[in-house]
Amino acid sequence: MEKIGLIAGNGSFPLAFARAAKQKGLTVIAVAHEGETLPELAQWVDSISWVKVGQLGKLIKVFKDHGVHDVLMAGGIKKTRLFDGALPDLRGMAFLARMIHKKDDSLLRAVAAELESEGITVRESTLYLDNLLAASGILTKRKPSKEEKLDIEFGWQMAKEIGKLDIGQTLVVKDQAVLAVEAIEGTDEADRKSVV
């Protein structure tokens, strides 16, 4: 049976991937992050190993020991864990010391490069999850109003700017005013802040 590795963060995304991969008949080897990954992931995978944020050497060893050559990352890790609660192993310490910028995109690309250097291919996170991807176009029963279209365009421009700055991935707007911007606290907190 083909194996796939799962680097699991928080939320339901890792569970959705594990279920989809099992339905495809794959053996799922998961590395889960303490304090982030939902414990019920263990029910959906063939093997689960728990690590603390920064234990990159342990993470790689798990996949190598199981003969895993393809992995993907699913779910987030609260960025605050890098500064509070991380317990990096030697490889993780060396990795973090090399990182000039600890921005989300920089970290993810560097982790992927580290895995690739060990012969582990990082696959797209939506592998086997096409059914969860939104189709292009209008997804509701009605078209956006003129005002909503202005908000969409305004929000798109603002989102591209915060993306360039690597601040976050979520932005909430209304009446062409920014109500919330995702920062270190994450998407869910940005959503909570925006409720009016």
What is the meaning of each model-derived region?
Residues 1-3, 24-27, 45, 66-69, ...:
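Short coil/turn connectors at secondary-structure junctions
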Residues 2-33:
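N-terminal basic/disordered segments at the start of proteins
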Residues 10, 76-79, 177:
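Short glycine-rich anion-binding loops that position phosphate/pyrophosphate groups of nucleotides
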Residues 56-127:
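N-terminal glycine-rich phosphate/adenylate-binding segment common to multiple enzyme folds
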